[in-house]
Amino acid sequence: MIVAFVVTFILTIAFGFEDEVDEENLLENKKEDKKETAVFSPLKGKVVSLKEVPDEVFASEAMGKGIAIIPSEGKVVSPVNGEVTAIFPTLHAIGITSKTGVEILIHIGLDTVNLNGKYYSSKISVGDSVHVGDELITFDKQAIENEGYNTITPMIITNSINFESIDCIKNNEVNYEDELLIIK
């Protein structure tokens, strides 16, 4: 028996062996690597480039890639299926992580943290499961603007570095739940 083992071992070393490659599984794994995530519009309004946001932190993409929306209404809905991972106490910003791992920050207005939550309301909490179109936050757009604040709303993919590409597929007016970004 030991002789059979030694002979088999020597023949394997001498001639090698080939693993059978399951072409179907190999193809399936490649498809999974190329998985895309659609991110839908969280607001109704006009889409603009982050470079057009009059705030250097957003315009420079220091926090990540994304887009901004000049809202026409005061409601923010979930752009993905996922989980609420952060809500600022002032309700001016919310973080969501999609089921595919895309981390999204929606920042309602510029310098609106200074309003200390005035004009904002929300019925969701950190840890809540959300679906595309679920209402996240409402805000009084007109009152915020009357206080002198810009309501332009950046939507940032904070873990942009983890993705090959983030493409905006809509460049003008958007409605709630319009497909807006494709992330690969």
Regions flagged by a language model, labelled:
Residues 3-184:
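Contiguous, well-folded functional domains in the mature portion of proteins
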